Amino acid sequence: MTNMRKTHPLMKIVNNAFIDLPAPSNISSWWNFGSLLGICLILQILTGLFLAMHYTSDTMTAFSSVTHICRDVNYGWIIRYMHANGASMFFICLFLHVGRGLYYGSYTFLETWNIGVILLFTVMATAFVGYVLPWGQMSFWGATVITNLLSAIPYVGTNLVEWIWGGFSVDKATLTRFFAFHFILPFIIAALAMVHLLFLHETGSNNPTGIPSDADKIPFHPYYTIKDILGVLLLILFLMLLVLFSPDLLGDPDNYTPANPLNTPPHIKPEWYFLFAYAILRSIPNKLGGVLALVSSILVLILMPLLHTSKQRSMMFRPFSQCLFWILVADLLTLTWIGGQPVEYPFIIIGQLASILYFLIILVLMPIISSIENNLLKW
């Protein structure tokens, strides 16, 4: 008799995706982040669901309802901090996952890569609307500043902003719709993640060498299920260390002050995972130029397959490209630091130089260095 997992219509899908899936025998721990992102998403949906049971999306009671969750709801504090810090873990895994894709040339799987970029945008949108919900000072002013950027769009900008706000300022209507968006978007992310996996399983996984691995495949279970479980345990360890020892480490103290439209905080800044993009936005003195640079900083990922000039897929055997990649990582860390600093000398000029370097590396230097490496290898 044939095994039920191979014949049952539902179990067959799970079997082909997680059990009998042929996987390259040499994929490293950098390939763990896909499954970790899945775990993060499930964790965020579950904790978010329990928070939504007690949260009220009204400007008068939103801040109090979050306080009520932390003080009066059984284990509400741990659910709230797991959700807040879970978002940080989500973005750490996301950045490492994208970085892995860039380093090992995974962007040559066009459909998988493009769905991944759409996923990145969707997760960023979800995190942004979620940050507004506690209705603290940084929530309110973050929402005001970021939504106001759309007013830079010629002709329709102002109307668009007021349409998103549901009035002439960020108010009750804005909070209610942001809560609705924040509730629905994770399910859209889950659906997109399924499409992401579907396209990935059409081609099979890439591997560190960038060489086709059809000649040497092993079943996903038990080899990579065990490997993924180790990753999950480490993820949960780091998350719980953060939640139980310093839950507010990555948050902003201003968000413990209820939203006040009459009092602007001295330094408006987003959560740490948006600081690199925020620094690029601020480095351009023109409003529309800044918005275009902000969007381009993520959208540039879509161009990666077009900018790939090397005859090799992976950077594993390309030392010059490796150096450039790690300079790009250092540049992004610099931008993240600058995004959290006040707009004054010397931070302005450092931010501008780091922003120029970011686009220069991706759009100009990487393709040139790859071509030089081809010539050095007599290709």
Swiss-Prot record:
Biological process, per Gene Ontology: mitochondrial electron transport, ubiquinol to cytochrome c
Q: Does the keyword 4Fe-4S apply?
A: no
Residues annotated for heme b b562 binding in this entry: 83, 182
Quote one Gene Ontology molecular function term: ubiquinol-cytochrome-c reductase activity
Keywords of this entry: Electron transport, Heme, Iron, Membrane, Metal-binding, Mitochondrion, Mitochondrion inner membrane, Respiratory chain, Transmembrane, Transmembrane helix, Transport, Ubiquinone
Q: Which cofactor does it need?
A: heme b
| Residues that hold a ubiquinone according to the record | 201
Q: Which SUPFAM superfamilies match?
A: a domain/subunit of cytochrome bc1 complex (Ubiquinol-cytochrome c reductase), Transmembrane di-heme cytochromes
Q: Where does heme b b566 bind?
A: 97, 196
Under the heading InterPro entries, the entry gives: Cyt_b/b6_C, Cyt_b/b6_C_sf, Cyt_b/b6_N, Cytb/b6-like_sf, Cytochrome_b, Cytochrome_b_C_euk/bac, Cytochrome_b_N_euk/bac, Di-haem_cyt_TM
Q: Where in the cell is it found?
A: Mitochondrion inner membrane
- Per the annotation, which location comes first and is thus the protein's main one? mitochondrion
Q: Could you confirm whether the keyword Cytoplasm appears in this record? A: no
Looking at the UniProt entry, the stretches that span the membrane are 33-53, 77-98, 113-133, 178-198, 226-246, 288-308, 320-340, 347-367
Q: Which PROSITE patterns is this protein grouped with?
A: CYTB_CTER (PS51003), CYTB_NTER (PS51002)
Query: Cofactor stoichiometry and binding?
Result: Binds 2 heme b groups non-covalently.
Q: Which GO terms describe its cellular component?
A: mitochondrial inner membrane; respiratory chain complex III
Pfam families the UniProt entry points to: Cytochrom_B_C, Cytochrome_B
Please describe what this protein does.
Answer: Component of the ubiquinol-cytochrome c reductase complex (complex III or cytochrome b-c1 complex) that is part of the mitochondrial respiratory chain. The b-c1 complex mediates electron transfer from ubiquinol to cytochrome c. Contributes to the generation of a proton gradient across the mitochondrial membrane that is then used for ATP synthesis.
Record note on quaternary structure: The cytochrome bc1 complex contains 11 subunits: 3 respiratory subunits (MT-CYB, CYC1 and UQCRFS1), 2 core proteins (UQCRC1 and UQCRC2) and 6 low-molecular weight proteins (UQCRH/QCR6, UQCRB/QCR7, UQCRQ/QCR8, UQCR10/QCR9, UQCR11/QCR10 and a cleavage product of UQCRFS1). This cytochrome bc1 complex then forms a dimer.
Family according to the record: Belongs to the cytochrome b family.
Supply the PANTHER family for this chain.
Answer: CYTOCHROME B
Other remarks? Heme 1 (or BL or b562) is low-potential and absorbs at about 562 nm, and heme 2 (or BH or b566) is high-potential and absorbs at about 566 nm.
**Listed name of the protein:** Cytochrome b
**Source organism of this protein record:** Hydropotes inermis
